[in-house]
């Protein structure tokens, strides 16, 4: 869900933000009427120093980054390898480092871990990992154990490496087929890809599906996120960009990056690497 605002100021005229109705409030934990958001678990978070888009030499390696509010990184359990131990969802929380929400799990043996919050999960739900787990939202198991047609997320590319695929808000992959130790998944991009059947995945879709509908509404909100302004190449001088210069506006060039690489239609996948695991390309 998301909410729109009355245009009482220029910054709220186009503003669309998540409603955060799925998140647990401090009042729910304390039994009060407080609507404050839950603070992250101290043992599972640490201060994340911003790079400002610079590499180890101090050079700008990623443009349009810098500033923004201080962030604490939440340590997420992407491996979900605590098998056979049931966990209770203590809270569903906001994470500034990703588009999806996260859920804090309290295991029966006392351990606590953060996971990506699946769609529909709420405080008090119970989840479990490992073979023989029920096929319900939030449970994690190997791909060979999950029936065909089930939607999954946080999928491993190699057994034991931790979830790498399908982790952004609102995404899910669908299990299409199982053959000779491999499982075919339909990815969110439309690509059909084969993975080892021993790779793990979590049942359900990722939370915060309306993330793509949100509008920042003003430049200042982008700066809070650490995003700096973008200058068009045509507004630059020839020394700064291939599109720069010219008397007036000139449009007789192929769209390029500041370093002369073609931006539209250029294939970026390494030709030397095997694509035998891709059953069907997303473009076909």
Swiss-Prot record:
Signal peptide (UniProt feature, chain positions): none
Domain of life: Bacteria
Region (Disordered): 28-50, 232-284
GO biological process terms, semicolon-separated: cytoplasmic translation
Single GO molecular function: structural constituent of ribosome
Any Pfam family: Ribosomal_L2
UniProt keywords, alphabetically: Ribonucleoprotein, Ribosomal protein, RNA-binding, rRNA-binding
Biased composition, class Basic residues, residue ranges: 36-46, 264-284
Compositionally biased intervals (Basic and acidic residues): 240-250
Transmembrane stretches, start-end: none
GO cellular component: a single term: large ribosomal subunit
Subunit structure: Part of the 50S ribosomal subunit. Forms a bridge to the 30S subunit in the 70S ribosome.
Family the entry assigns: Belongs to the universal ribosomal protein uL2 family.
NCBIfam families (alphabetical): rplB_bact
Function, as annotated: One of the primary rRNA binding proteins. Required for association of the 30S and 50S subunits to form the 70S ribosome, for tRNA binding and peptide bond formation. It has been suggested to have peptidyltransferase activity; this is somewhat controversial. Makes several contacts with the 16S rRNA in the 70S ribosome.
Protein name per its UniProtKB record: Large ribosomal subunit protein uL2
Organism (species): Chlamydia muridarum (strain MoPn / Nigg)
């Amino acid at each position: 869900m998301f909410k729109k605002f009355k245009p009482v100021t220029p910054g709220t005229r186009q503003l669309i933000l998540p409603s955060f109705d799925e998140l647990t409030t401090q009042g729910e934990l304390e039994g009060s009427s407080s609507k404050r958001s839950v603070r992250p678990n101290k043992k599972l978070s640490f201060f994340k120093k911003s790079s400002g888009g610079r590499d180890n030499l101090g050079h700008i390696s990623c443009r349009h980054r810098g500033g923004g509010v201080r962030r604490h990184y939440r340590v997420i359990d992407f491996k979900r390898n605590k098998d056979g131990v049931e966990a209770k969802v203590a809270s569903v929380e906001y994470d500034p480092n990703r588009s999806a929400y996260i859920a804090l799990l309290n295991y029966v043996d006392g351990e606590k871990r953060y996971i990506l919050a699946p769609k529909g999960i709420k405080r008090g739900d119970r989840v479990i990992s490992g073979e023989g787990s029920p096929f319900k939202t939030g449970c994690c198991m190997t791909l060979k154990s999950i029936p065909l047609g089930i939607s999954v997320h946080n999928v491993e590319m190699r057994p034991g490496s931790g979830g790498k695929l399908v982790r952004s808000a609102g995404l899910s992959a669908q299990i299409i087929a199982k053959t000779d130790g491999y499982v075919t998944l339909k990815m969110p991009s439309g690509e059909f890809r084969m993975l080892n059947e021993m790779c793990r995945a979590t049942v359900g879709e990722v939370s915060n599906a309306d993330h793509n509908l949100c509008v920042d509404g003003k430049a200042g909100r982008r700066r809070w996120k650490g995003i700096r302004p973008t200058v068009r190449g045509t507004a630059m001088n020839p020394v700064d960009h291939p599109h720069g210069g010219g008397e007036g506006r000139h449009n007789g060039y192929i769209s390029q990056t500041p370093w002369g690489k073609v931006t539209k239609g250029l294939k970026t996948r390494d030709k030397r690497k095997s694509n035998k695991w891709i059953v069907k390309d997303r473009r076909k």
